[in-house]
Amino acid sequence: MNYIKFDEKKPLDVIPIGRVTIDFNPNEINRPLEESRTFTKYLGGSPGNIAVGLARLGKKVGFLSTVSDDQFGNFVVNYLKNEGIDISQINRAKNGEKLGLTFTEILSPKESSILMYRKGIADLQLSSKEVSEDYIKSAKAIVISGTALSKSPSREAAFVALEYAKKHNTRIIFDLDYREYTWNCKEEIAIYYSLAARMSDVIMGSREEFNLMEGLISPEESNDKETAERWIGYGNKIVVIKHGKDGSTAYLHDGTSYKIKPFPVKLLKSFGGGDAYASAFIYGIMEGWDVIDALEFGSASAAMLVASHSCSEAMPKVEEIKQFIKEKKEEHGEMVVRG
């Protein structure tokens, strides 16, 4: 069912916009970060991971960001290119800004943390002049990362992209993607998140992220239904609110809602599932699936990622996700995540 109409004449399917980083995941797990001696390098950052996830699922993907003008920047550009992602709109930082670095700590399957270096960061240097109207026009949808709204000039660039998308019937998917270290205060988060959300067609985020977005207009925490109704009232077609291990719910503009639970899986780490969830869910709605099927697909992809060492490198293909779902249903029953 087409809850959202995408312009099928456009050559690109999706353009994620914003953060791309380098992840260093420890090879020695179940120990503190200070005791880890060796790491494996991966591409990271939510928009970067979502781009890779969608490309693995067969979508035609572009990417709009700024990366460092050094070896790590080369790594990111080459990695995305090798995944079949269009790199024509990836810019290079001009004043020595670097890619963000993320070191992960895996103390146990349920206890993980991340250490981020985000000072003088390249992706926040994307300027409004580097946002091509023709490029945004060429895509069926863009994915805006909340982190891209946190600092200038990236903030202004993101809103220019939003304006171009509205002008040219390019659908807007807003991934709240909150990272505390990039914002000055909670009021700033609420203002800029709300402005972007009022322009979006789909919003995806955790309950905590929605609370931050609604901090000024609703000082008392809203329940999920109230939150969904608020943002659907501004024109969104789908609002997805995630509750971690308790699952997630998609609220639709026609008043219906669908809930999905996580697939049972042996965890390796407690991070990385959200980007896989987003890419697989976006794939499902772009394919015209029922929302419950898109949610199930997203939940399956997320489960596969939290059982893997990496994020971007482990992004699955369509048949791999379908096989995972088939096996889990054979083991646990047809309604394993829908009941």
Swiss-Prot record:
- Under which EC number(s) is this enzyme classified? 2.7.1.92
Gene Ontology molecular-function annotations? 5-dehydro-2-deoxygluconokinase activity; ATP binding
UniProt source species:
Clostridium tetani (strain Massachusetts / E88)
**Carries keyword Isomerase?**
no
Q: Which PROSITE patterns does the record match to this protein?
A: PFKB_KINASES_2
The UniProt catalytic activity note for this protein reads: 5-dehydro-2-deoxy-D-gluconate + ATP = 6-phospho-5-dehydro-2-deoxy-D-gluconate + ADP + H(+)
Q: Which SUPFAM superfamilies has this protein been placed in? A: Ribokinase-like (SSF53613)
The protein's name is 5-dehydro-2-deoxygluconokinase
Write the record's keywords in alphabetical order, separated by commas.
Answer: ATP-binding, Kinase, Nucleotide-binding, Transferase
